[in-house]
């Protein structure tokens, strides 16, 4: 069976520093890049890559095995350090790209995101947008639970993340981040 390659970065490229917002070495050192397989919206199997904290690698492998088994479509999985994105969260969301580690702050705050520690993943941002009362990202994205690739409370993807101790941004009260799952920080990170 032919596999379509969405990302084939080497670890050095996937973990290169963002010159605009350098990551402390002790955080960068804990990140691992893993290959993941999934059906994309073309109905074919693709191979991508996700960078996450070493403590959550097994969780992400388990989730992507489930994604593949259930044919939950993923647009792409490409690290944000890839030249297509240059660490830009807006660009990766516009592309509908699934991503993990991104040393950055939470939108419109000065607090570090769980992505900054590699303990969060965004899945299909175009189907699962970030929505506040003032705006949504990516632009013109709609949350429609009937669309393929949309995460729903109680579905198998949600249930697996929840069983592994991850929190879903779709449950937040002040905003909805349907694409976002995060594993709470531990003292070790």
Predicted regions and their residues:
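N-terminal module-boundary/linker segments of secreted carbohydrate-active enzymes
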Residues: 1-46
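Generic structural hydrophobic/aromatic packing signal, biased to beta-strands
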Residues: 33-36, 63, 67, 101, ...
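Catalytic cores and adjacent binding grooves of peptidoglycan-active enzymes
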Residues: 105-112, 117-189
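A generic structural signal for short, non-catalytic loop/turn and secondary-structure boundary residues
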Residues: 26-31, 94-96, 114-116, 174
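Extracytoplasmic/periplasmic, Sec-exported soluble proteins
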Residues: 24-28, 48-59, 111-115, 149-153
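Active-site-adjacent loop/helix surface patches within enzyme catalytic domains
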Residues: 78-117, 128-130
């Amino acid at each position: 069976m032919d596999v379509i390659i969405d990302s084939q970065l080497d670890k050095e490229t996937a973990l290169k520093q963002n010159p605009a917002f350098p990551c402390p070495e002790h955080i960068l050192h804990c990140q691992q890049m893993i290959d993941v397989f999934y059906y994309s919206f073309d109905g074919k199997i693709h191979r991508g890559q996700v960078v996450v904290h070493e403590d959550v690698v097994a969780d992400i492998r388990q989730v992507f095995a489930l994604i593949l088994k259930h044919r939950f479509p993923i647009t792409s999985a490409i690290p944000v350090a890839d030249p297509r994105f240059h660490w830009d969260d807006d660009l990766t969301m516009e592309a509908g790209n699934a991503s993990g580690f991104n040393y950055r702050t939470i939108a419109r705050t000065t607090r570090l995101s769980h992505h900054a520690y590699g303990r969060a993943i965004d899945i299909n941002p175009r189907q699962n947008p970030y929505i506040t009362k003032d705006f949504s990202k990516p632009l013109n994205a709609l949350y429609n639970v009937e669309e393929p690739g949309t995460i729903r409370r109680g579905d198998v993807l949600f249930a697996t993340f929840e069983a592994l101790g991850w929190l879903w941004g779709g449950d937040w009260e002040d905003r909805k981040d349907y694409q976002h799952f995060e594993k709470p920080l531990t003292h070790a990170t």
